[in-house]
Amino acid sequence: MSEIDILSFGETMAMFVAEQTGDLAEVSAFHRRIAGADSNVAIGLSRLGFNVAWLSRVGADSLGRFVVDTLEKEGLDCRHVDIDTAHPTGFQLKSRTDDGSDPVVEYFRRGSAASHLSPHSIVPELLKARHLHATGIPPALSESARQMSFELMTRMREAGRSVSFDPNLRPSLWANERQMITEINRLAALAHWVLPGLSEGRLLSGFEDPADIAAFYLDQGAEAVAIKLGPHGAYYRTHLDQGFVAGVPVATVVDTVGAGDGFAVGMISALLENHSFAEAVKRANWIGSRAVQSRGDMEGLPTRSEMSVEFEAAIAGKPAPTGFASVGAGLPRAAFRR
């Protein structure tokens, strides 16, 4: 195996996206894609030129073959995706919206192949990766997947590798809210970079203000925290620095799903390239804004060449081919209070 830049893990599902608006029960035609926050980030990083290994599990079925084929076409190393002959590949149905509102998503993943991930799925060779990206979704799938998440994050941190963590809360997958909060915060304590949304941070930390939420995670052991503030942008804090970075205005919001994954792609890629945290947030905001202008979870994630042209034009305040406005900073703290 060639040198691995980034290891990511989790569940990739087949996704059937409605081709017309309306209630899913009344939709007659769907377009097949793939979905999964963890693999969205992996794909985004692969498009930027990183060597990304994907650790997962799919069923021995047509949807599983479709998932693996799609990931491999995106450049992911899928040699450690296990084929499960006893459990199916999960899938989801996603509604279509034309007004920028959140789509309705129905999941069919209980008992899926990926829910049977376990510490036994970990291959020593994968632990040589420079960086591990984790989210709160795999630990919500099952006890064995939760054990794997803890072991991967612990071993990578102990080995001196950098670890990023996006809570990506999925309350419906947990037994109760208290368990979710406890386990997600335990995992966050194993990460160097923590990337919650504002509502997630409030629920998990018990604090309202972004600065206090960030301090909560810094006190637990994080080196840096970036809190997503939707269209407003993001607040970041390290042990030495803090600030707001304004969001990137977009003309039309097509699909909000995947914006947070795009943000993670920007943060991880920039930090692994030794950019400052403030510069990483600028890139993250830009990729997140690009994601919401595309129909689909990963379609808006840029290639390296696209980013070189569009992002550089955006931060320079010049008209970019996609029409993005420049990225600024200094939003008022009051804008992020309830």
Residue positions per predicted region:
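Short, conserved phosphate/pyrophosphate- and ester-handling motifs at nucleotide-, phospho-/glycolipid
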Residues: 45, 197, 260
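Glycine-rich phosphate/adenosyl-contacting loop at the front of the ribokinase-like
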Residues: 1-77, 252-253
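Conserved beta-alpha-beta core of the PfkB/ribokinase-like small-molecule kinase fold
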Residues: 131, 137-215, 232-234
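Conserved phosphate-binding/catalytic region of the ribokinase-like
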Residues: 1-7, 154-158, 206-313, 325-328, ...
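Short beta-strand scaffold segments in enzyme catalytic cores
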Residues: 43, 91-95, 233-236
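Conserved N-terminal subdomain of the carbohydrate kinase-like
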Residues: 51-136, 310
